[in-house]
């Protein structure tokens, strides 16, 4: 849903600023760039199957604070960041109209590598669940996109699935 229905950049910006502010820390553009570098590397390692998602989310702020010499609990910070991210509900333009149209003609499903609690919260807050037949989240399945095992699991759990008539819409050529 990030980058396809929701504006992840806006949600991330909101969550970063709110979490830093709540901890009385200044989020400068330089700090954000360092975070993005660390986060991007971790997600790339996740996509390659080198690390799991828990390692991604629970080490990025630990690494950031260590690099910056900031005495802050990165794990607790991550929990607060995820809560704030889960409340960053910014739909992309025309998302509802597209969902309304497509859901009347096709069965829609969510397939995501996002953090489960964050994804469920945003779908609920935006009342988007009604458009989807099911939600497939990598941390619940045990395999991440784009691993074939992830998609095989999804396909097995979709009644009357036909890959010749299916379309997956994503925001990344490396993870979708």
Walk through the language-model features, giving the residues of each.
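Active-site neighborhood of HAD-like aspartate-dependent phosphohydrolases
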Residues: 1-37, 67
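An amphipathic alpha-helix signature
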Residues: 12-17, 54, 58-62, 116
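A metal-dependent, Asp-based hydrolase signature
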Residues: 41-80
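Substrate-recognition element of Asp-dependent hydrolases with the DxDx(T/V) motif
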Residues: 76-79, 84-88, 95-124, 132-138, ...
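Short acidic capping loops at alpha-helix termini that bridge into adjacent secondary structure
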Residues: 27, 73, 130-134, 162-166
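Conserved Lys-Pro-Asp/Glu-containing loop-to-beta segment of HAD-superfamily phosphomonoesterases
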Residues: 144-176
């Amino acid at each position: 849903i990030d980058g396809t229905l929701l504006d992840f950049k806006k949600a991330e910006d909101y969550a970063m600023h709110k979490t830093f502010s709540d901890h009385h820390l200044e989020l400068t553009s330089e700090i954000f760039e360092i975070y993005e570098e660390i986060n991007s590397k971790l997600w790339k390692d996740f996509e390659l199957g080198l690390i799991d998602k828990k390692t991604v989310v629970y080490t990025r702020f630990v690494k950031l604070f260590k690099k910056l010499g900031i005495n802050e609990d990165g794990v607790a910070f991550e929990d607060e960041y995820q809560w704030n991210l889960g409340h960053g509900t910014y739909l992309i333009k025309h998302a509802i109209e597209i969902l309304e149209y497509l859901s009347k003609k096709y069965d829609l499903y969510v397939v995501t590598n996002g953090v489960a609690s964050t994804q469920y919260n945003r779908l609920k807050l935006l009342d988007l669940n009604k458009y989807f037949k099911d939600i497939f989240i990598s941390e619940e399945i045990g395999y991440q996109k784009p691993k074939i095992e992830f998609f095989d699991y999804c396909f097995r759990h979709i009644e009357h699935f036909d890959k010749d008539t299916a379309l997956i819409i994503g925001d990344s050529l490396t993870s979708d």
